[in-house]
Amino acid sequence: MKAHFTIYILFLLIVSSLYSCKSAKLSDAEEKQRIGEYYEAAAIYRKVYTKTSPKKRDLRGYIAYRMAECNRLINNTAKATSAYMNAIRYDYPDSTVYLRMGQMLQKTGRYPEAIKNYDIYMENDPSNLLAINGIQGCELA
């Protein structure tokens, strides 16, 4: 009888510890990003992104963009580039994604690709100085 009781108590402890584990939530990531904890926000966005179904294209695009912004702000260019690519693949509606993608590609020395992204961005905002200077910088490199 004691063995069954011990197993039962052990089972309850394991189950309760599993329920107490905090799962990654989009709202948690947004809050971390809002207060400037970009590294933690990027990690949470990554977990949420992998748990989100590929069928939810709008949500995955949004999460990818936010994750890219966090990685850009902590100067993690490789992860930011990858996340911007995912945001573009999932048709993120804000054209700023092309400007940021151009900046990340320029930073890694991929100048022809950067110019293409700057050009796509400039279709919506032809007088943007960041894009103009980015293109000139790529051409001079």
PLM regions: where:
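Register position in tetratricopeptide repeats
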Residues: R34, L73, K107-T108, G137-A141
